[in-house]
Design a protein with these regions (language model features):
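Phosphate-binding glycine-rich loops of NTP-binding sites
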Residues: 1, 5, 30, 166-172, ...
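Electropositive, glycine-dotted interaction segments
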Residues: 1-119, 123
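Short, mixed charged/polar active-site loops
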Residues: 9, 151-154, 242
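Residues embedded in well-ordered beta-strands within globular domains across many folds
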Residues: 68-71, 129-132, 233
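Phosphate-binding P-loop
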Residues: 175-177, 208
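Residue-level preference for the first positions of well-ordered beta-strands
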Residues: 179-181, 213
Length: 275
């Protein structure tokens, strides 16, 4: 691998075809013009069409790699963690354990986005004064979150589980380069109804950009009432096998949905096809 004018050149072998990608500063990949349509070993020629098809396959692969899955573990989120970043953009670990490094990465990418996250956190938690990502050089480079309340500074391991969860959700949903797909497990865990309402609103704003799809799982009737019936997919088990259905497609629910919200229908067992 070599570098020239801040451009990275890499050789890739796909189906025995060898060619060179050029990676721009934007992260986009292109075929280096000098080699476009020609095998490096001169064994044969490859068409531009084939090359472009390989690039499409690579784009799909990188898109999948950037999918964001979240099943947060506040205990791991509160502990100092070593910096492991190897690229310009990083994903939040599914358990949220690298939240400090993830926030530090956001700060470096776009300071305004970071400050917006802090301001929203202040709105949710009025006692918050500031948020910092602290770095320690003892026993290696470790980073951790520190929250300022009045005149007290609290490290992440002293913060509530709800605070850590809200912070992780805001960071992922406000990221300057949001993931193409975000999947959040039991999003309401540790959150009060007011915070759930705000997070759902954040999801709506992100989805409206049409750059990201968000899938959440929940057992909360309150959260379901914040959604339209058409946005809900019910998962049930039938003889041990998962069954997926859209309650909005049930004709028997049309009249019920005029009187009750999805959350109430859920508690009444009306969303189920068995109901």
């Amino acid at each position: 691998m070599s570098y020239l004018s801040k451009k990275k050149f890499s050789r890739y072998h796909l189906n025995n075809l060898k060619f060179i990608f050029k990676r721009e500063d934007t992260g986009k990949f292109f075929i280096q013009d000098k080699f476009q349509g020609q095998c490096l070993d001169s064994e044969s020629l490859i068409s531009t069409f084939i090359v472009r098809e390989k690039i499409k396959q690579y784009d799909i692969y990188t898109n999948i790699l950037n999918w964001q899955f979240m099943s947060l573990n506040p205990y791991l989120m509160g502990s100092p963690k070593p910096i492991k970043r190897t690229s310009k953009y990083i994903n939040l670990a599914s358990d949220g354990s690298n939240i400090a490094e993830y926030l530090l990465n956001i700060y470096k990418l776009d300071q305004n986005v970071f400050e917006g996250i802090v301001e929203t956190l202040k709105y949710i938690l009025p006692y918050t004064r500031d948020l910092q990502v602290e770095e320690t050089l003892e026993l290696g480079r470790n980073v951790y979150i520190e929250l300022t309340e009045s005149n007290f500074k609290l490290p992440a391991w002293l913060l509530s589980t709800g605070t850590l969860r809200i912070l992780a959700l805001l960071a992922v949903l406000r990221h300057p380069k949001p993931a193409p797909l975000i999947v959040i497990e039991e999003i309401e865990n540790g959150l009060d109804p007011r915070s759930v309402d705000l997070i759902v609103d954040e999801i709506r704003k992100l989805v409206e950009t049409e750059t990201t799809q968000v899938i959440i799982t929940t057992h909360s009737p309150y959260l379901l009432d914040l959604l339209h019936l058409s946005q809900i997919i019910l998962v049930e088990r039938d003889e041990g096998q998962p069954i997926f259905s859209r309650p909005a497609d049930q004709e028997s629910l049309q009249e019920w949905s005029k009187k009750f919200g999805p959350g109430k229908l859920y508690t009444m067992s009306r969303l189920s096809q068995k109901g």
